[in-house]
Amino acid sequence: MASTESSLLRSLGLSPGPGSSEVELDCWFDEDFKFILLPVSYAVVFVLGLGLNAPTLWLFIFRLRPWDATATYMFHLALSDTLYVLSLPTLIYYYAAHNHWPFGTEICKFVRFLFYWNLYCSVLFLTCISVHRYLGICHPLRALRWGRPRLAGLLCLAVWLVVAGCLVPNLFFVTTSNKGTTVLCHDTTRPEEFDHYVHFSSAVMGLLFGVPCLVTLVCYGLMARRLYQPLPGSAQSSSRLRSLRTIAVVLTVFAVCFVPFHITRTIYYLARLLEADCRVLNIVNVVYKVTRPLASANSCLDPVLYLLTGDKYRRQLRQLCGGGKPQPRTAASSLALVSLPEDSSCRWAATPQDSSCSTPRADRL
């Protein structure tokens, strides 16, 4: 439509160049929905994400020390979510102003970088929680060795650095360009570099999403098989129910936030590379734009994990909100997600090598 003056190239934030196909140049469609959907959804994520994660950080820092390994992972997850939601006001303005970016190229690069940094750090922190939980349920002795808070802290630092290192090329791909009086902040890159960007993005997706997703599914599959096997003369313990809640929340975050975004983004890239016809490009572009807010919504869903799995976290949160009596702080955090089977017995020693656990036979678990 001439009134919208919105071609596929404009909707993608691109201008004609050596990498543009004739299909893209000739395909026109209305994308005004984006200028309502994205500002509104990002505003909701900003309000909810900041409102949920800022108090969470405060509780972790001032009320929930000392941390166990799981609390360490959750703190870094909340920190990642908070950093991301603080960048959303610029995107809210950008889409509300119909793709006009007045903040400069450097901030454009940083905001686009921060989106993927949060996305993949969240994926890896959730994977760390999943592996940690798996070890506690299925291999309690190994959990003694690998579940130390210091090791968890080093692993979190490695996650931040590895994800940042993998995404450094994104700082070079993403840029701004002018369209008349409008300044665009590209979500991908220039048309002439799009092929290279797809190769880079696909490698990052496989390494930072595909592998962690597979590891998480395997861990939770093995955990669920063990947890759902009945124990003679024993009801399901609270620790087992907490484990099942953890499985449900993490899988929900993956299913709602991460999987749809990566599937639609892959189809979107393929449609452009294969020069699909206008109707297909139209549909794919709309679906891809719709799933972007879902990827951001993990910043709002992650705090649900803290509520469902941390008894001490819930108590401290009630106190922060004005309800409940103060509880004495103890060294053992009930945020710990490593729990041994109900009918296991352990002898704790100064070192993991000297500790031992006796668990039921495999045919009874």
Curated annotation (Swiss-Prot):
One of its GO terms (cellular component) is plasma membrane. GO terms for molecular function: G protein-coupled purinergic nucleotide receptor activity; G protein-coupled UTP receptor activity. Pfam families: 7tm_1. The keyword Cytoplasm does not apply. Residues 1-34, 96-112, 175-196, 270-287 are extracellular. Disulfide bonds join 108-185. InterPro entries: GPCR_Rhodpsn, GPCR_Rhodpsn_7TM, P2Y4. The keyword Metal-binding does not apply. GO terms for biological process: cellular response to ATP; cellular response to prostaglandin E stimulus; G protein-coupled receptor signaling pathway; phospholipase C-activating G protein-coupled receptor signaling pathway; positive regulation of cytosolic calcium ion concentration; transepithelial chloride transport. Changing residue 339 to A: Greatly reduces agonist-induced desensitization and loss of cell surface receptors. It is a multi-pass membrane protein. The modification Phosphoserine is found at residues 333-334. Its main location: membrane. Pancreas. It is found in: Cell membrane. This is P2Y purinoceptor 4. The lineage of its organism: Eukaryota, Metazoa, Chordata, Craniata, Vertebrata.
